[in-house]
Amino acid sequence: MKDFTKFHSDKEIAKYLISEFDNSKEKEIFSATKKIITECRKNKSGRTLLDKFLSEYGLTNDEGVALMCLAESVLRIPDDNTKDELISEKITNSNWVDHINQADSLFVNAATWGLLIAGKVIQPPRALFDNPLEWIGKLTQKTGETSVRQAIMTAMQILSKEFVMGNDFDSVIKSSNLKKSIHSFDMLGEAARTKSQAEGFYNSYVEAIERVAKLNREFGINHGVSIKLSALHPRYETLKYELTKKEILNSILSLVNLAYQNDVEITIDAEEQHRLSISQDLIEEVAMSKRIKDWNGLGFAIQAYGKRASNVVNWANELCSKREKMHVRLTKGAYWDGEIKFSQAGGHEGFPVLINKSLTDLNLSLIHI
């Protein structure tokens, strides 16, 4: 694949991606995707609460969009007044009546009634004498916005748990999914800001590797651990790299060697684009270290939204020609909003990520093919 610079023109990259894409693959991709979706829909017994919600409230109707906005935002808002305003905006302008008793889940149907009632509480109904649902408005006008806020916060917390298997290993090991499919365990959190935070993250990774090794032996499956390099040092940045490289390298080598001893796969997570070159340098140092050079349990993530994603693929191919194979986690990217804001605040000549998200999809398809 062709190499691009950090702030390369989106227009030039688009021309290249379109010229390289094989249209004959489109039907194959569509067919494979349709097959996966069909199989997932058939397995109703294994559907999570989130799946059931999305079946009724997709992104094809106003109600689904409203719920997704709430799920994304309401848990992050610190003050009650702003929460009330957001809930009022998203709930009262949606037509929940059309969704009553339409789902195959009692929980989702009950939630629909709750959302309908919430809409009436926040914005009391007009005289609905001809509407069979008039009693809802009369019944709930006395409840008040505080109760609605608390109920919706609780509902969103229930939904948010679908994205995280557990807050600690003791809760994670109760999941039956551990016996059925492979997982990579990640420590949710931001980069380390202090030395004590970095030490805490390091100790958490040590514990994670040891606990995952135990799970693997117990279930006979190959779960792994994902490691974020910026969690291992508070000054993991280009300007300080020469001063901090040895410390960071020692930390990551120690963790990877521990994983090697326990045969636990390690994936080095992707970072923001301004850390890409130093991340590649560290990964190469670790990958070529004498002890694990012949171990195929090491891998890393590639973010398709990065303009230099193809550069990373070319670099990875060259690296793997010198050692045992490595696994790659191909993602669209995790920091798009942050990357845009970072470049704007810094007055950069462009953006290090593709602005048009459809180009990210195309780039991901080309890398995958």
Residues covered by each model-derived region:
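Positively charged, amphipathic and often flexible ligand-engagement surfaces
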Residues: 1-366
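Calmodulin-binding IQ motif helices
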Residues: 369
